[in-house]
Amino acid sequence: MKLIFEKSVPGRRCSILPRCDVEEVQLPQELRRQEAPALPELSEVDLSRHYTELCQHVHGVNCGFYPLGSCTMKYNPRIDEEMAALPGFAGVHPLAPEHAVAGCREVLDTTSRYLCQITGMDGMTFQPAAGAHGEFTGVLLIKQYHDARGDHRRTKIIVPDSAHGTNPATAAMCGYQVVNIPSAADGCVDLEALKAVLGDDVAGLMLTNPNTVGIFDENILEITRLVHEAGGLCYYDGANLNAVMGIVRPGDMGFDCIHMNLHKTFATPHGGGGPGAGAVGCKAFLEPYLPQSAILSEGEHLQVRAFNGNFLVVVKALAYLLTLGREGIPEAAENAVLNANYLMRRIQGTFQPAFDRICMHEFVLGLEEFKKETGVSALDVAKSLIDRGIHPPTMYFPLIVHEALMLEPTETESRETLDQAAEVFRQLYELAYTDPEAMRTAPHNAQIGRPDEVQAARNPILRWQA
């Protein structure tokens, strides 16, 4: 397939613009480009065909099973999109006078109230644009709290090895030294390792519960108690909130602040269908540092994004919450856990889970022994799934499991879909022993086979050039 730039023909147009009825204004020379931008020139039909062809080469939740672990690729109800497309929401200007955006304000306030009830927090902001941005905002709350108290010796953030992947980077970006602690044999936080690193130099702990191997840490109250006794705060990464929403609240576990991925847990499209929203909630004592709730003094800057963040994502999330209601929210979490355990047990006769115990919303397969026996890697299995209409699971993560495949089926998949997926895994397991080369060269039917990822990382080509 050609790039859109390669289809460009000079002078070809697809836009019909009305005649200009205002006077021309000449921009100052210093504000003008020196040369025209390199934009493709196509007719409308060519443009339509190009993007139609592109969509036929991608795989989304609307196309088939998408068990991308730790990403919660659930189906996004169409009604959410319809609500976000209402003119009063889609056409609003962020600088409109307050009386003209009362409905938008009500959306933000109502969603904030519901999310505080679900998470056990007291304050909420929707400014962060995505999950990692929410993490960044949450850790800055912790930093500002300690700084405001003159407690500048707290320079470390504890991050377990089963935490979400962006946590160490977030802590480092906020200026903290990252202290990694290992998991115990059961996949949960090693309490003795935690106790060994706690001290008056610890600012806080970043934790996901359930963690990235899909296990709910039963020692969570003890973990947060230990951190608080050492003077630190506890940050909850909401990446896996889908497993427990409406059932248990992070605030009741002892967490002081949290970010949620509205674009995951609350069914607003992501993974190319975005944008996202990394809502951040906190306990009352941190509210003065929350971007939208603080009263700004002259020259002070307490924003992490312009206006109210990605507002239409909040509209979609509210539509989702209202559709499910108080009874439907915990039911969705229960079905997510049920589906994950069902699929894990169906697959277990072939590929083995890294932790042979009841999981939450996701589980991790460990293919290290399988690779030794067959020469087929986790990557080969993932690529082979593409030929069978299934999006690959998350590969080689978490790092504590060798040859890892992480699957999260979500609550919106039917039993029939899970049975079909389990059958595909069984077929691939047998194929690895009878024709491993077929798997090592997969995919065979995709538009792109196996790009050179090492070369792409070392010498990235990020834009088209003539």
Annotate each predicted stretch with a short phrase.
Residues 1-123, 147, 248, 303-304, ...:
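Non-catalytic terminal extensions of PLP-dependent enzymes
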Residues 59-80, 127-135, 266-281, 310-313, ...:
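Conserved phosphate/anionic-ligand binding catalytic regions in large, soluble enzymes, centered on
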Residues 93-96, 128, 208:
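Cysteine-centered functional microenvironments
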